[in-house]
């Protein structure tokens, strides 16, 4: 189903072009037309950036698209103090040694949004299910690149990974 949706989006993108496609996606999401000539809302500005800036800033977008590689960029810019503590980076979930992790942490797929697992207490966690789910997500992301979504406008050069970070709580 996921791959099928991506193929349909890609066909539509090729048929009507990037700018019209993005306007259609905006209309679908926000139920109104975007003002790309004079963007005022944050969402309009993001869509404007998708249309115009990614052609000129592709190397930077590539770097910042991945949750792990963006960390190096932030360090180079002197922003390391804003980064969450990183416990590990893994090519697949089978590499994770849960015994070496703190009691609470968050696992994230580096080239996605919403594919995160919050572990508040590892003593009550089902590690087999966690590994199975993470590997499924990685497979979907890495194989889905062949049928990448035109919403992104490019395919990240490297495979997605899993990162494990300190779990931060609101006060």
What role is predicted for each listed range?
Residues 1-58:
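Membrane-proximal basic amphipathic "stem/tether" segments
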Residues 53-54, 63-170:
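Active-site nucleotide/adenylate-binding loops and adjacent lid/helix of ATP-dependent enzymes
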């Amino acid at each position: 189903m996921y791959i099928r949706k991506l193929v349909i989006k890609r066909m539509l993108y090729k048929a009507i072009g990037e700018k019209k496609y993005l306007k259609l996606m905006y209309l679908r999401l926000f139920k109104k037309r975007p003002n790309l000539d004079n963007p005022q809302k944050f969402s309009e500005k993001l869509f404007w950036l998708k249309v115009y800036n990614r052609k000129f800033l592709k190397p930077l977008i590539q770097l910042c698209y991945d949750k792990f590689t963006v960390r190096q960029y932030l360090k180079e810019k002197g922003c390391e103090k804003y980064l969450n503590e990183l416990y590990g980076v893994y090519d697949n979930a089978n590499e994770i040694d849960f015994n070496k992790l703190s009691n609470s942490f968050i696992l994230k797929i580096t080239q996605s949004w919403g594919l995160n697992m919050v572990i508040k207490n590892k003593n009550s966690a089902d590690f087999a299910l966690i590994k199975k789910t993470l590997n499924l997500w990685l497979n979907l992301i890495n194989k889905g690149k062949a049928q990448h979504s035109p919403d992104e406008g490019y395919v990240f050069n490297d495979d997605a990974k899993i990162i494990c970070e300190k779990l931060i709580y609101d006060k």
